């Protein structure tokens, strides 16, 4: 479930890669260069912050070997420092509030799980020590370490995911969905992407339990460039 965090951060990194300006490929094989050169961007270098009203972070894992159980996080944030001239200098950071997990449980949880002491399945997942243990570990974080272009709109993003006090590298596949020179409601450039990835819960110290070990995460978001506030007007003479 924590994998969400990784996904959210990594996804951001992937976006950077997918939408950064093409680098000088002189001397490189023509076919390979053409197949991975990123599309031209309208967005410019700078810091891009996630638009929380246009973002989602979901995770799923095998359940009873017959289906995939899916839930989401409602509170998370991400920031991309985009350098279109040098992709290696671009950075992505993300944080997730594990207490915001939303299982959308439709049954009578209290009536069927009275012994747990939790008021809902979402609270159980968030606070139970065998799951997200949000009281002891109130944040899941991700910081990118590498972005590798794989196509004109795709990239692999690797970063450090810290979950349950354990930090491990996670790699995600990201897709650049498009960008705007000027957002229709905000006077600034905007960019969007999707990302997916997988990791094992046991790698972060979570017991296997009755559900699957491998977690799949899916992240979709729009990012808007930070604009410096206008300088105050000079006082009248």
Tell me what each language-model feature is.
Residues 1-23:
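Gram-negative bacterial Sec-dependent N-terminal signal peptides
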Residues 19-237:
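Low-complexity, acidic/polar, glycine-enriched regions of mature
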């Amino acid at each position: 479930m924590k994998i969400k965090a990784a996904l959210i951060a990594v996804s951001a990194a992937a976006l950077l890669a997918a939408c950064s300006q093409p680098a000088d490929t002189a001397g490189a094989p023509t076919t390979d260069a053409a197949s991975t050169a990123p599309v031209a961007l309208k967005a410019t270098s700078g810091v891009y912050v996630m638009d929380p009203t246009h973002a989602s972070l979901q995770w799923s894992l095998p359940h009873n070997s017959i289906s995939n159980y899916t839930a989401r996080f409602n509170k998370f944030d991400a920031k991309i420092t985009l350098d279109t001239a040098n992709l290696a200098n671009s950075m992505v950071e993300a944080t997730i509030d594990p207490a915001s997990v939303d299982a959308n449980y439709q049954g009578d949880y209290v009536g069927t799980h009275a012994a747990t002491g939790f008021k809902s399945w979402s609270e159980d997942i968030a606070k139970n020590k065998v799951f997200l243990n949000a009281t002891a570990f109130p944040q899941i974080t991700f910081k990118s370490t590498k972005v590798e272009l794989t196509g004109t709109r795709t990239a692999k993003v690797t970063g450090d995911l810290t979950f349950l006090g354990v930090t491990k590298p996670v790699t995600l596949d990201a897709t650049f969905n498009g960008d705007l020179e000027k957002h229709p409601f905000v006077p600034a450039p905007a960019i969007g992407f999707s990302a997916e990835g997988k990791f094992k819960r046991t790698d972060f110290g979570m017991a296997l339990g009755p559900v699957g070990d491998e977690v799949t995460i899916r992240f979709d978001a729009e990012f808007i460039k930070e604009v410096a506030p206008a300088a105050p007007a000079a006082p009248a003479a």
